[in-house]
Amino acid sequence: MKLDFTRKNAIPKKYFIGIKSIKMQTFGWRLLDLDGFSLMTFWAQYGEFIKLALIFVAIIILLKFKIPLSGAIGIGAVLTVALYGIPVLDSLMIAGKSMISEATIMVLLNCYLITFLQRMMELRGHLDLAQRSLSRLFNSRRVNASIAPVFIGLLPSPGAIFIAGSMVDTACGDYISKEDKTFVASYFRHIPESFLPTYSSIILACQLTGVQMGAFVLGMVPMVACLMLLGYLFYLRKVPKETGEAASTDKLADLQSLCRSLWTIAVIILLIVVLNVPVYIATVGVIIVYFFTSRFTWQEIKLFFLSALEARIVINTFVVMIFKDLLTHTNVITALPGLFEALPIPSFLVFGLIFFVGTIVAGSTAIITLCLPMAFAAVSGAGMPLMVFLMSCTYAAMQISPTHLCLTLACEHFKTDFGALVKRTLPVIGIFYVILTGYYILLNLFF
């Protein structure tokens, strides 16, 4: 059929529809492939990380709507299974193994024992005595709310947050909100975790890199001071310094009272650090000695066997551990270097991002094991400065990670929202990262 294109409506409708279809298809392909950009290629390269982002955004939104943390993370676990296509049977097996794994059992056991010890100390008034002794020694609520959690933080157990939280609650009173108290207790309790060799992550990092433990601890001292200062400037200065108690007239007697009130914690720490005794064995031993030295009776402590086992803590522990193991199963953490390597920034910052994101997703141990040797091989002149930088990145990321069980326990202790804790922590670690970057550059000038 011959067509006259000069006449209006000369093209039959069926040809017009065909031409329109071709145009739409062409337009569609231009959307998919515009100047070399392909959505298919983009999804292949970044799809796994988009899924990860969606999971964490969903958790944040759920927390915003006051969904309990266990429920929000539980839904996050379900989304992980759905988005990453983990077979249902496999996901159930992962969940089951996670619930009965040695790591989960040890966390629950240590939390139970520390809570049991806390109940005993409260019954004998030793936590209150520690507060009064600190108040008389320093006459400062701010010292009580910061130094006490740091000391308790020497104990490498998630359950230590309960004792730290109790002391912060008493020291801060009604001068700050319970959300602020949650931050103060969690933040200062975790500062020792950033540099002390009582924590397995520090030991593992030194073993993998060959950096001397003493050199690392010395290199971390300025950053520890920075953490203390930032915590004070953001929140502790809201608390009045004065305790309302008379200044000490006998410092030695007050120091003895402090030692008498906290000797149980000190002995557990010494057993762990000096003799390498497992936390649960050290705690059981101290509880037995404490029972006799403080003349407890069976009637006094028998209720603690049940009250120290709190259902919500058990549930939260199971949910967090399952979520972390499901994320680890996706292997998304192993693809992080490919995501950040093309960024136009120095290599140490690339690995800083990898460690930050990887720690939020899978925790410190996983990212240290997988990526620390890679970082030391890729960054020229790697040594103590790089380890200080990367371990600080890991530490800071743990303070906002939903896979960090201690944060969950802190929120449970104060009955606060996890999102509120993250909101208060982000500005602090943001400034910490800026200072840390400058400190790394400075260290490289001398080491």
Model-derived features: positions:
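Short helix-coil transition sites and intra-membrane helix breaks within transmembrane domains
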Residues: 68, 106, 118-125, 153-164, ...
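C-terminal transmembrane helix pair
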Residues: 201, 216-229, 359-370, 376-447
